[in-house]
Structures are given as structure tokens and as C-alpha cells.
């Protein structure tokens, strides 16, 4: 015999972005609860609207399985005295298991007799276990929480009702002043309370009260309605997945509608129109058959088609007000030159402990120039980069960005184009913010990429200089994201980026240019270096590189980021080779024996005592001449070829000879080889089987 169990949490409207993850969390914790309580079950349907989270569990077992188990107790010599009487230990053990000493049997384990009790545990019924679901409800976590009434209890929103039905029977539970029952709520305006006769009635009963509880069905309905409106008007609609998800979690009974705005607003930059409609009002913008934006939008109301004309008029009025403001700001911004806006950045603080935004831009310009030389940019790209670096933050003081902060960079590109800046300069202004998330798009242009790296590295050096270093989960200036972005960009272009050396070089360049702003860039250089190495680890882990290889390639504090990434890829590419194990063992042996050794003598080949010493040294010298500055596949193959000479060397040579001169000479030779191996990190940490 199996059952259906319905559990619903009824709340005030939740923020849209919380609904889907909260439902998944509710499901996962319920599955864990059932598993912990040994209650078998079938499929679990998940339901959610802004006002509710609900689960319908199918084929729920009537009860737990009856269990028989043997419980081990103390040794026989402890359980009985010399006369065979039960001791307090035996009596207490049996009482604790709900049994008596008469139930005790003995079993021999490795020659020792132990007390055992055979227990038959009758399974609890589902009805007896399910009140524990209250703990699952209480355990849900949310990004923000609130209290209500006089209660100390916190939740995403106040809970107004609970439904807990095992088939047609209420499973009792109480949270604060809310008793679980069989009554749920229909649509806030169109429906009424619904008393459920059975858990299976849930979906149909709420649909009759203008609530579609299945998220997928509701989303499909929204999509179908939007596509129908678009077809009727011959529009193209970008059915953005994130916006569709958000709108879906704002409504219980969706009705899509079309609205319009004055054509004159199409003169506003498209990015502003999209932001106003999509981000601010949650509308879907429309294009004609040629892809040109039209003065129309599609919205979704939480209700039916009654009085839809009033709804449309209200939405059009709100959007028109936003667009009127945008048009005004757009006109005002064009009254000033880029030079005017750059000068105004002197009054804009980057951070009160660091400098103005104007000074930050000046530092970034110095860094960008230095990086351009290292990365081998052309003269044209260098000129474009220098121009972009001298103005790239100017849009921060524009009225449009003040009203729409999410358009910073985008408006900078647009205004730069209007002012006649070269396309490469304008594009770099937009791209310097990228990537805007851990897995966000990287800049497409070389100029934009270098500007993005320079800007982010200036931020890192500056915040570390004033000891504003991320700790734990605290990272208010998104420095981890910026550092991660730098590593991703370096990886894409395989550009050299030796963090430790680069910090010193940049600090010297800024000092020479008079652009340090009294910042002590030497204060936390080692901390920033380690910080960047950690981000390289993250990038490699995201590429599914083995943890031991990641650890091996990131041990060098002075390592180049590109070199770290290349070494990891090369080692990972060969990890399944049949000869990988002996190669790593041979190279690792060299690193282990030279670890912490400091030898200040030159290699004297006259002190070699066997042929293997000369053979390995000659091979090392020849390999060093062909080695690149950073790890390459050819370098790996060269080291691989040294595996046999290394093994032959150790078979014939006692490195730590009693004669100090011989020992120092051998270590000096091995240290030269170790320096080559260390291009790939500490390969002795690579796990081989």
C-alpha cells in the first residue's frame, strides 16, 4: 500500500529570484528526510508560485520496513562475574536496548566472547514520521530573511498557511500560529480559498482558482502567449531565458499583452531602450522582420484579460516616463565633450583610501603601456590603447550612467563613437569591464583585453597597497572576480604575466611617472602574488585538471601565470601515457634530493667519477640551450628523454658523498637540471600509480 503526500508552504510574495532555488532546496531536503527515515517513495512533483512552495510525493511507503539487527555489547568477561551472574554492565546494556539479560546470546569474535542482543524493530508508519517535515520547512535557507509579528523566527517572507495531506488525512504540524490543514489559497484577486479533499486534487483545484502551480506549464503558457502576440504583429521577440524565468516567478495566472511607446524614443540608444524595458520593467522588447527595434513591447500581468486595456495604458505610462527621462539625459550628455567629462573624474572617488577615478585612470594608462610592450601589440594597437586608457572611465559622470549604472562602458562606447573616436578605442571602453562574471564573455579585441587587464590589475595593486584584502567570504570590491578574469584573459592569449616581477616593474614605472598617489605598492606584494596564484588554481580546477597536477604547477611563488597554465595542460595531456609514471618518478627524484640545497660552486666535470655523471650533465646542458622561457610540449619531451639518464645516474652515483667537494659538485649539476624541471613546478607532487 502506498500513498500520496502533499506539503505546501504558503507565503507572502517571494522575490522572483528566490523561488526556483528555494523549491529545489525544499525538494532536496525532503528527499534527504525521507532517506534518513527509511521511507521509500516514487516521483516527487515540484510546484511553486510567488506565494507558495509545494511538493507532491507519489508512491510513498505506508511504513518503514521492519528491521532485525544484532546489537553488540560488552565482552562476556565484563557481562558476567566469576559465578556467571549478570553484572551491572550487562543489565544496563540490555535495558538500554529495551530488553532483559534473558535475551542475551554470546558470539565469539577473534577468540573473544561478546554479548549480543537480537532486536526486531517494527517500522514506523508514514503518518507517524511525516510531522517531522516541519523541521525541513524550518531548515530552508534564503539569501535574505525577515521576522514578523512578535516572533523571533526568520524566513524569506511571512508564512500564512500550511497544507499537509497524506492522501485525504491531515498530517498535523504547527509553525508559530499556523496549523497545517487542507486549505490552500487561490489567486490573490481572482480566486478564493480551496479546501482539498485529497492530496491528488491539488493541481486541478488550484487551476480552478486561477493558479497554475506547475512552473514549467506556466512558463510554456507565457512563451506561447508571447509568440502568438509576436506572430499577430509580425514581430521578432528575444525570449530571454533569464527574463522569462523571472516573469514566470512573478505570476500565478499569466496573461501577456502588447504595449507601445512613441516612435521618437527610438532615437535613444538601443541599449537604453532594452535596459528600460527588460531590466527595469521586465518587458520583452520587439523587432520587425528586418531586426530593427520597433516602438512596442510585450508584458505579462498576473491576472486574466479583464480590464486589460487599463493595464496596458498603465504600463505604457510608466515606460514613457522612464524613456522621457532617458531622452533628457541623452541630450544633456551630448552638450559636453569627452575632455569635459574626463576632467570631472577628478571629483569622483575611486576609493577614499586610494585616489580619484581620474588618478586611477592615469595609473591604468601607465600599466597598459607597459603591458602592451610585453604582449607584443602593434604600433596601431598601442596608440589606440593609449587613447582608450586616457578616457575610458569618462561615462561614469554622464547623466545616462547615473540613471542606468548597468550601462557604464556601453554608454562610453556609444558616446565615444558620437565624438568621432576610432572604433577600436570605443570598443575597448565597453570591453574593459569584461568579464563581468566568473564565466562571463571575455573582450574580443586585443586593445580591449589589455585595457581590461590593466584596469583590473591596478585595482588589485591599489586595494592590496592599502590593506583592503579579501578575507574569507568578504570581498566587497570583487577582487577575486577581477583576478580570476585576468587569469582567464592571460590564458586565452598565452601572454606572459609573472605577477611578482610585474608588480615591481609597474611600481617603478608609476613612480617614474609620478602616478603612485602615495600608495605603498610593496606592502603586500607577496600577498597579491599568492592571491593571483590561487585564482590560477581556480581556473585550472574549472578545466577539470587533476588536483595533484594543479598543486604541482602552482608551488613557485615567482611563476608566470601563463607558464603555470601551460605546464598544467601539458602534464594533464600526458597523465595517461604509459611512460608518465617513470618520467615523473625520475624528475621528482631530482627535485627531492636538491630540495633546500644551496650550492655556490660551479660544476667541475673533472670531479665526475663515473660515466653516468658526465652523460646526465651533458644532456642537461644540451637541453637547457633548447629550453623556452615558459613550458612547452618540446620542453616536456626533452625532460622525458632525460628519464633514463637520470635513473642510470642514481643507480651509479651516491650524490651525498662523504667528500664535500664531490657532494657539492654533484648537487650543483643536479640543481641545474632541477631548474629546468621546475618550469613545470614541483612534479614530485604529481600522484602516479
From Swiss-Prot:
The answer to whether the entry has keyword Glycoprotein is: no
The highest taxon in the source lineage is: Bacteria
**Database matches in SUPFAM superfamilies:** HD-domain/PDEase-like
Q: Which Pfam families match?
A: tRNA_synt_2f
Keywords for this entry?
Answer: Aminoacyl-tRNA synthetase, ATP-binding, Cytoplasm, Ligase, Nucleotide-binding, Protein biosynthesis
- One BP annotation, GO: glycyl-tRNA aminoacylation
Give a GO cellular-component term: cytosol
| Single GO term (MF) | ATP binding
State if NAD is listed as a keyword. no
User: Where found?
Assistant: Cytoplasm
| UniProt catalytic activity | tRNA(Gly) + glycine + ATP = glycyl-tRNA(Gly) + AMP + diphosphate
Look up the EC number in the record and give it.
6.1.1.14
Q: Which InterPro entries match?
A: Gly-tRNA-synth_bsu, Gly-tRNA-synth_heterodimer
Q: How does it assemble?
A: Tetramer of two alpha and two beta subunits.
Q: Which family does it belong to?
A: Belongs to the class-II aminoacyl-tRNA synthetase family.
The record ties this protein, via NCBIfam families, to: glyS (TIGR00211)
Query: What protein does this entry describe?
Result: Glycine--tRNA ligase beta subunit
Amino acid at each position: 500500500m502506498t500513498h500520496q503526500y502533499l506539503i505546501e508552504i504558503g507565503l507572502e510574495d517571494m522575490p522572483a529570484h528566490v523561488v526556483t532555488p528555494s523549491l529545489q532546496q525544499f525538494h532536496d531536503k525532503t528527499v534527504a528526510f525521507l532517506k534518513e527515515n527509511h521511507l521509500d517513495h516514487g516521483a516527487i512533483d515540484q510546484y511553486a508560485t510567488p506565494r507558495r512552495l509545494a511538493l507532491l510525493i507519489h508512491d510513498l511507503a505506508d511504513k518503514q520496513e521492519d528491521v532485525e539487527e544484532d546489537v553488540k555489547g560488552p565482552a562476556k568477561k565484563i557481562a558476567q562475574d566469576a559465578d556467571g551472574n549478570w553484572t551491572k554492565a550487562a543489565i544496563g546494556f540490555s535495558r538500554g536496548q529495551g530488553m532483559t539479560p534473558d535475551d542475551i546470546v554470546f558470539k565469539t569474535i577473534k577468540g573473544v566472547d561478546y554479548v549480543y542482543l537480537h532486536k526486531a524493530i517494527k517500522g514506523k508508519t508514514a503518518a507517524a514520521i511525516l510531522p517531522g517535515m516541519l523541521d525541513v520547512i524550518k531548515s530552508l535557507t534564503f539569501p535574505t530573511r525577515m521576522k514578523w509579528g512578535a516572533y523571533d523566527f526568520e524566513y524569506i517572507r511571512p508564512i500564512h498557511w500550511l497544507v499537509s495531506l497524506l492522501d485525504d488525512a491531515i498530517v498535523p504540524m504547527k509553525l508559530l500560529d499556523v496549523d497545517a490543514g487542507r486549505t490552500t489559497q487561490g489567486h490573490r484577486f481572482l480566486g478564493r480559498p480551496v479546501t482539498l479533499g485529497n492530496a491528488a486534487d491539488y493541481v486541478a483545484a488550484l487551476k480552478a482558482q486561477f493558479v497554475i502551480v506547475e512552473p514549467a506549464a506556466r512558463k510554456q503558457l507565457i512563451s506561447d502567449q508571447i509568440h502568438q502576440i509576436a506572430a499577430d504583429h509580425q514581430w521578432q521577440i528575444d525570449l530571454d531565458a533569464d527574463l522569462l524565468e523571472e516573469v514566470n516567478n512573478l505570476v500565478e495566472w499569466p496573461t501577456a499583452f502588447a504595449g507601445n511607446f512613441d516612435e521618437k524614443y527610438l532615437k535613444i540608444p538601443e541599449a537604453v531602450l532594452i535596459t528600460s524595458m527588460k531590466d527595469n520593467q521586465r518587458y520583452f522588447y520587439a523587432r520587425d522582420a528586418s531586426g530593427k527595434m520597433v516602438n512596442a513591447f510585450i508584458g505579462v500581468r498576473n491576472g486574466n484579460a479583464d480590464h486589460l486595456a487599463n493595464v496596458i495604458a498603465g504600463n505604457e505610462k510608466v515606460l514613457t516616463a522612464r524613456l522621457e527621462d532617458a531622452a533628457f539625459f541623452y541630450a544633456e550628455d551630448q552638450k559636453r565633450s569627452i575632455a569635459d567629462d574626463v576632467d570631472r573624474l577628478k571629483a569622483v572617488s575611486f576609493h577614499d583610501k586610494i585616489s580619484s577615478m581620474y588618478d586611477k585612470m592615469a595609473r591604468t594608462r601607465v600599466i597598459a603601456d607597459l603591458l602592451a610592450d610585453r604582449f607584443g601589440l602593434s604600433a596601431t594597437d598601442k596608440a589606440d590603447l593609449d587613447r582608450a586608457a586616457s578616457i575610458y572611465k569618462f561615462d561614469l559622470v554622464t547623466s545616462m550612467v547615473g540613471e542606468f549604472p548597468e550601462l557604464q562602458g556601453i554608454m562610453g562606447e556609444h558616446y565615444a563613437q558620437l565624438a568621432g573616436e576610432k572604433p577600436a578605442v570605443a570598443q575597448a571602453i565597453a570591453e574593459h569591464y569584461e568579464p563581468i562574471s566568473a564565466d562571463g564573455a571575455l573582450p574580443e579585441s586585443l586593445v580591449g583585453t589589455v585595457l581590461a587587464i590593466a584596469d583590473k590589475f591596478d585595482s588589485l595593486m591599489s586595494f592590496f597597497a592599502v590593506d583592503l584584502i579579501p578575507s574569507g567570504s568578504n570581498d566587497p570590491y570583487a577582487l577575486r572576480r577581477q583576478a580570476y578574469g585576468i587569469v582567464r584573459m592571460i590564458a586565452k592569449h598565452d601572454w606572459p604575466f609573472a605577477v611578482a616581477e610585474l608588480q615591481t616593474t609597474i611600481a617603478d614605472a608609476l613612480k617614474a611617472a609620478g602616478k603612485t598617489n602615495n600608495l605603498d605598492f610593496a606592502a603586500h606584494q607577496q600577498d597579491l602574488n599568492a592571491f593571483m596564484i590561487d585564482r590560477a588554481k581556480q581556473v585550472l580546477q574549472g578545466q577539470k585538471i587533476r588536483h595533484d597536477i594543479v598543486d604541482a604547477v602552482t608551488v613557485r611563488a615567482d611563476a608566470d601565470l601563463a607558464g603555470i597554465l601551460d605546464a598544467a595542460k601539458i602534464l594533464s595531456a600526458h597523465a595517461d601515457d604509459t611512460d608518465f609514471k617513470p618520467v615523473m618518478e625520475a624528475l621528482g627524484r631530482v627535485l627531492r634530493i636538491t630540495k633546500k640545497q644551496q650550492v655556490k660552486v660551479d660544476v667541475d666535470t673533472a670531479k665526475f667519477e663515473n660515466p653516468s655523471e658526465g652523460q646526465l650533465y651533458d644532456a642537461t646542458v644540451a637541453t637547457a640551450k633548447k629550453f623556452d622561457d615558459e613550458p612547452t610540449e618540446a620542453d616536456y619531451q626533452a625532460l622525458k628523454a632525460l628519464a633514463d639518464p637520470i635513473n642510470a645516474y642514481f643507480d651509479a652515483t651516491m650524490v651525498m658523498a662523504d667528500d664535500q667537494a664531490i657532494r657539492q659538485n654533484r648537487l650543483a649539476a643536479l640543481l641545474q637540471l632541477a631548474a629546468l624541471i621546475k618550469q613545470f613546478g614541483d612534479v614530485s607532487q604529481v600522484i602516479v600509480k
